[in-house]
């Protein structure tokens, strides 16, 4: 009889431990998923990058992280209308043979341009360290132009397109924008999800 009681008590203990572990997993799962968020990037958010430019529309703050980890950006839906003629593109952008004399944001990032343009209107991003974002006067526009004292340096711009996962080594903010330079006639935008540490 005593042996039967011990076996029953052991089973009850195991059941309680198993139930507790299941509850912990259920509570932890939504916490992890909570780091993913939806972001809309308007079709005119060029960050004042490129040459010539017509509007200083800042990049969109998409995700702020407090330390190292992996950030994932995934295109969900949307198109950008690039001009008054109604030309549209998806997140990978389009090529432009008639854009000679224009430097797009990704060209500026590489220190090139003024020739054939690829990825025009594409979804692009930049990760800015927290130390720069917190400086007085910071805005998510081109920091090499006279528009402000503290901005984003173009060398950090990168193509996201339909999606990108990348690692960051420090606290900071991911900003998203559009690879275009004349944006006054742009409309539409991209819906994306962003997840991070």
Predicted segments, located by residue:
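Short, Lys/Arg-enriched N-terminal segments with co-localized hydrophobic residues
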Residues: 2-4, 33-35
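Serine/threonine-rich low-complexity intrinsically disordered regions
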Residues: 8-10, 29, 67
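C-terminal segment of classical bacterial N-terminal signal peptides
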Residues: 24-33
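Gly-Asp-aromatic-enriched flexible segments
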Residues: 36-197
